[in-house]
Amino acid sequence: SGSMGLTFIARASQPSCITFPNHTQNVGSFGDTISIHMNRNSSAFTHTVRYAFGNLSGTCIDAETGKAATAVTTGFRWTIPASFMELLPTVTSGSGTIYVDTYNGSTFVGTKYCGFTATVPASVKPSASIQVLDNTGINDIYGNLVKGLSKLYVKTTGTQAYKSPIKSYAVNANGVRYTAAEIVTGVLTKAGTTTVSATVTDGRGRTSAAASASFTVLDYTTPTVTKLSVMRCNEDGSANKRGGYCKVTFSAVITSLNSKNTAIYYLRYKKTTATDYTQVTMS
């Protein structure tokens, strides 16, 4: 019987992101900081840790030191770059690879890898803004929008989140839903406060928070003649059943519109046998 020493065979370290090496592992979200374990076969080994994601590659940056992940012994922490999401404009998750180059002193031992999968956080979504204008010029005249007269021009702008394109628009205005970036409403149908809101949805299917704006809409009704009487009279307006003049008395109501509305009254008359009316302005 006897004994003999066995030669140490250096084998590259097998990295893991969570527990099991050599499998793609769901590590959380882009922007999260994860632990990468070297699982080294010798305490003499050091490592350089690299990443590959889509067409991007490079040396990982240690989240604790801010330096490149070289001379790593047992493990380190890495923040998955949020910029990776720019390569995922139409999906909400993506996979990459962690490569670990193992060294024994200055001697290169080999490279092994593990995969990882990260998701786009729910907080990553587009944003929306809106511009709302009076499309009729009514607001400039009366200081407010006016029911039955004003129309709104609404322009919705969507801002991409990590290069995910804006795919659709949803605008709610005047009780109607629109699906275009620029719209003009029909005439406003309700008085009081009207609110315009809009959202955008991107290529990942993420919908923005609503952008909204509220406006006061003045009530408006068409002018109404509430009283009208006609009598024969003299030139001075005194009653005379045989007079050669006609005295017209009337009352009418118009909507104030911030005391900026005015009225012009017209009287039309004709002989019974005539076809056309004659119109005069009344004061």
Residue ranges and their predicted role:
Residues Y103-F108, T201-R206:
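Short, solvent-exposed loop/turn segments at the edges of extracellular beta-sandwich modules
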Residues I98-V100, A198:
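Hydrophobic/tyrosine-rich beta-strand signature of extracellular beta-sandwich/beta-rich modules
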Residues I80-T97, F108, V184-T194, S283:
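Surface-exposed, short loops/turns at beta-strand junctions within beta-sandwich domains
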Residues I9-I18, T117-A128, T216-V225:
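Extracellular interdomain linker/stem segments of modular secreted and single-pass surface proteins
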Residues N22-D32, D134-K151, R232-Y245:
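Short, solvent-exposed loop/linker segments at the N-terminal edge
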